[in-house]
Structures are given as C-alpha cells and as structure tokens.
Amino acid sequence: MRASVLPDKPGNYIIVLRSTSSLPIKVQISTTPILTSFDYKKEKYNVVYVGKSSKSLRIRDYKQHFTGTAGNSTIRKSLGCLLGFKLIPRDINSPQNGKTTFGEFDERTLTEWMKDNLLLFYYANNDYANVEKELIRIYNPPLNLQGNFNKTNLDFRKELSALRSCTSAKQAPIPNNQLKLNTYPQQLQCSN
C-alpha cells in the first residue's frame, strides 16, 4: 500500500481482507463474525471496517491506521486485541486516563500483518458522514463498534468491545485459530 496514491482530501474508506486472508482470532472468542463482501475487478473482498476522514484520506487512512499506533486507531486496537496483544497505557504521564496502545514490538507486528492481509478502498467526497453511515448499514463491518446497529455480528462486537476494554490480555491465546472465510464499489478506488 502506498500513501502517495491516496488523495489529500476528505472522504470514506473501506478496509477489506485480501482474498487469501481471514481475520486473526488468537484469543478465546465464542462468536464468528459474518463478513459481507463486494466485487472489485472480478474479485470478492470481505469488508472488516469502514470509516471517514474529514480532512485527508492520506493522513487518516495510511498514517494513522496502517503505520500509526493503536492509541490513535480503532481498527488497530481491535485487530491487536484479536491477535492477543497486551494493551498498555498510551500516556505514560497520565496512565489513569484509560487510553491504551500496544508495545513497540506488537505495534510493528500489527503493522506488518495489516500490510500483508488488508487492502484499503477509498472514495473522496464531502458527504463523508452520511456515506459512512450508509456503508456501515450496507456492509455491517464487524470491526465497526460505533454506529453499527445491525443485529448480525452484535454478539461478536460485544465480545470485541470487552476485549478492548481490558487493560491486559486476560484470555489465553489460541494458536493458529483463524476465521473461515452494493452501491459504492463502482466509485471506490483501491490504494494498492
């Protein structure tokens, strides 16, 4: 993924699994999410997260999500928790504020996992708030915890929220446990 192909404009983005990838589930979680997909160039992509950027798709999407830290990216925090990474206080001088991130090694591991397993589609527009609501309604991405009112994946989102609210990994990792595997796609562009 190259940041230079993303516009320095507001808009929306959809984060999908590469066709050969699945969500990483390395912790005990009882619900398997149902993934919705869309077709792009004769390939199906499972949607895991959608979002909006009010200023710059380049900065929000690439710099915060794909090269940032979990302290500033909800998708990074969700994926890291699913990978079983231990949450630590983000602000050393203010650990009681409840803001968390992962250690340096885990953040690097997460960045590599994301670059290897995810793709980002984007749609530059100025109606990003309404478009985001519609994308969440249409695709029901399991990692969108706010604004997702779909009953499908509700139990998964509750379990993921509980994982994210813990300040330490309370559940033992499960080795090699991975999940098995439409109106906006015409306007979306892939950043890969």
Identify the meaning behind each predicted range:
Residues 1-192:
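Boundary/linker segments flanking structured domains
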